[in-house]
Amino acid sequence: QGDVETTFCLPKPTGEEEKFLKIIGMNQVPVVWRDVNYDYLKSRLPDYTSPEEYYSFRDHIYADFSYMHVNDLGCMEFAGGYPKNLHEEINNYSIIAGVVARRQEFDIIHAHDWLTYPAGVHAKMVSGKPLCIHVHATDFDRSRGQVNPTVYSIEKNGMDHADCIMCVSELTRQTVINKYHQDPRKCVAMHNAVYPLSQDLQDIPRVEH
């Protein structure tokens, strides 16, 4: 907000997102070239994606993904939530991130959780821009120590490539350092918080009960 421009890459936007963000629906980014006319695109794309943007993304498809399951626009669909093919959707999201990173101009990449770490790593490799990942919890926390090796591998690869690792607590930071063998200098604890009250609200007398 303010002097920060944020591009928010969502797998499956609802159309109800905050307007101060630039929304990119990853399910509207083509990965397979399709010859689609302008009027048809206007009828198929949501308000937050223009035909011009679609064509621009189409020009930045970087590999042959014709073996992937795509729709009539050459885009991949996402189930949303935590489907049975979750790891496939994580991989698909990272493929699309490669197209987006080749098209967009930005200063820093933020990967919100382990599901988006592969996409963040891909965007960093494409752009050379720094990657900051957010760690709300690790698989050590979620599994009570019975770690899923696939999830651990995704988490660690994201951490290894990250320039900054934001942890929601000092406990999480220590887990990242000790269990994922990360450099303490790039791990910071940033607690979930709210904005402080403005002074005029702080000056309102408290009611004594």
Language-model features, listed with the residues they occupy:
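Nucleotide-sugar donor phosphate/pyrophosphate-binding loop at the beta->alpha transition
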Residues: 89-96, 129-132, 140-157, 196
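A short beta-strand/loop micro-motif in the catalytic core of glycosyltransferases
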Residues: 109-110, 160-170
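A conserved catalytic-core segment of Leloir-type glycosyltransferases
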Residues: 5-101
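Membrane-proximal helix-turn-helix segments that form the acceptor-binding/catalytic region
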Residues: 98-103, 125, 148-165
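Histidine-centered beta-alpha loop that forms part of the nucleotide-sugar donor binding/catalytic region
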Residues: 11, 135-138, 191-192
